[in-house]
Amino acid sequence: MDQVSIEMSSTPRPTMVKSKSQLSLRRSLTITFKDLAYSVTVKKKKMQILKGVSGTVTPGELVAVFGPSGSGKTTLLDILANRKESGEISGAVLINGNEIDDDYKRLCSYVVQEDVLLPTITVRETLRFYADLKLPKSWTEKEKHERIEQILEQIGLSHRADAKIGGVLPGGIVLRGLSGGEKRRVSIGCGLVTSPSIVLLDEPTSGLDTTSAMAVMKTLVELTQQKSVTVICTIHQPRSEIFKLFTKIMVLAEGRLVYYGNRPVEHFTEIGFPFPDQTNPADYILDAVTTIKEEGRADEIADRLQSSYLDQANQESSSTLTQSQLGIINASGKRKINAYNNGLFTQFLVLWKRTGLDFIRNPSNCLVRFAVAVFVGLLFGACFSGLGMDEKGVQSRSAVLFYLVINMILQPFASISLFISKRTLFNAERASKLYHTLPYYLALMFFEILACIGTAFILGTITYWFADLNPGADKYFFAMAILTLAHLAGDFFMLIISCITVQVDTSFAVGAGVATIYQLFAGFFVPINALPKSFEWLHWCNFVYYSFEALMHNEFVGETVNCGQLACPTGRDVLINLGLNNRGKGINLIIVSSFAFAFFTMVFLCLHYFHREKR
């Protein structure tokens, strides 16, 4: 057996944490799971993903969950992290022999496979964001700073602390920043802010080159050896150098545990799979498990393992427990754990600061919008400059007012990609209990509303004065108010579409169709009194119609058309010819405001209920 002996790393002796900045409240935790099973129903057919998986991981151990695709690795990790929100779960998860309590999500950190980070902020700012939201309120600024510096040293990124994360921004803008391996270490660092006792990672080396993967694994090894952290991670076909870093290997096949220990090669050799020379142990084990799966032996081997040393180890680790002490997971797998360390207002302030930095540093958020507004405003001004109040001027004034409103619902198309690009980040951070939906939404909308106000005023002001529209100050500010509200209503409506649809392309297609309907039934192309009765409702629920009507009232009521005759039409006659209502412009202002507020509320509801990380 010596020729196939692969020695795994030995388990280090636990270390004590002494200073507050190292979170002295952290305890060394042993995680025990017994008879875990998980199933989902797909098209009325029940699929068993995990079947009777048991094991114990002690402090200072670095355990790999290994197996072919579809064997249940990520599912097991989700259950251990208490983040499985769908399907049926049964079994027990114990921490130091006790059932999971409200502190579990503070003691356990889960690092997902994808590096979900905001590209425009720096490494230090990212860690500070997590520190502000995850650390207790009692921590001072100095203590938070010390903690962040410790983490930067732990993950080996002190020299890159002020570098931006980097990535592709909406619109295809590439922001240079960290490498893939460095981003992965930042993700791990975010999970270490609270100095957790248990760290769970889903394929931490996936997609990384050899050097980056080894750097990530060395970070995890140091966590176990220096901090006595319990680390469990899924992994897929690692290099032999990485494979040897693990203290134990957990092998899954078809949802069953077919091996758990520190001598996997010897085990699979004993059950009939000779180990070829010069072979990566990970590849060898994967080939063996694939053969076991093809031969239908997974249940047999798992049952034999369960009845032997694994079952004995579990009994020894929890021999003093009664059945009532087992942390049995309910059928839905859901637990209501209040894992927020800070209130809604604190969450809002932290999110407001980060969102502000992102808006300033992302050109697509403001600069591009404002530049487009200036260009379109100058174009409108050139086409409609110096309009008079004669019959031709009335027609041109009506046109410029209409197209101003239409532009207010076309500009928000830029918001769709910006909003959708942040969805994955929002879902991941909310699932990690960093913050609630409400403070995130309010912080995001604070800057979105500012951008909308700026865009409306830039475009509206340039066009207003070039076209020589009604010069009264009250007329100007009312027009700007209507344009701003129309822009906000259009922006919020496009965000509703982006919440309901999944892809950016779909959102653009649906948004374009809706915008066309808005234009057609706004009262400019087709007079309201010329519409078929069956279509009348389309303009009553059209905020573009009310916006256009308000601007027309503002521009023409009280004015007289210069027609060169004794009896010239008045401004109200102009409105009547278009079939516009005689309601006051103040009423229209209230109606458009109501549309904007209703859409604003609907965006929040869609964001809160439609988009959750599905696990």
Curated annotation (Swiss-Prot):
Signal peptide: none annotated. Residues 364-610 form the ABC transmembrane type-2 domain. The keyword Protein biosynthesis does not apply. Gene3D superfamilies: P-loop containing nucleotide triphosphate hydrolases. It is a multi-pass membrane protein. InterPro entries: AAA+_ATPase (IPR003593), ABC2_TM (IPR013525), ABC_transporter-like_ATP-bd (IPR003439), ABC_transporter-like_CS (IPR017871), ABCG_dom (IPR043926), ABCG_transporters (IPR050352), P-loop_NTPase (IPR027417). It comes from the Eukaryota. Residues 31-279 form the ABC transporter domain. Induction: By hperosmotic shock provoked by sorbitol. Its main location: membrane. The keyword Membrane applies. Keywords: ATP-binding, Membrane, Nucleotide-binding, Transmembrane, Transmembrane helix, Transport. GO terms for molecular function: ABC-type transporter activity; ATP binding; ATP hydrolysis activity; ATPase-coupled transmembrane transporter activity. The chain crosses the membrane at residues 370-390, 400-420, 442-462, 477-497, 508-528, 587-607. One of its GO terms (biological process) is transmembrane transport. ATP binds at G67, P68, S69, G70, S71, G72, K73, T74. It is found in: Membrane. One of its GO terms (cellular component) is membrane. PANTHER family: ABC TRANSPORTER G FAMILY MEMBER 22 (PTHR48041:SF81), ABC TRANSPORTER G FAMILY MEMBER 28 (PTHR48041). Belongs to the ABC transporter superfamily. ABCG family. Eye pigment precursor importer (TC 3.A.1.204) subfamily. May be involved in cell migration. This is ABC transporter G family member 22. The gene is abcG22.
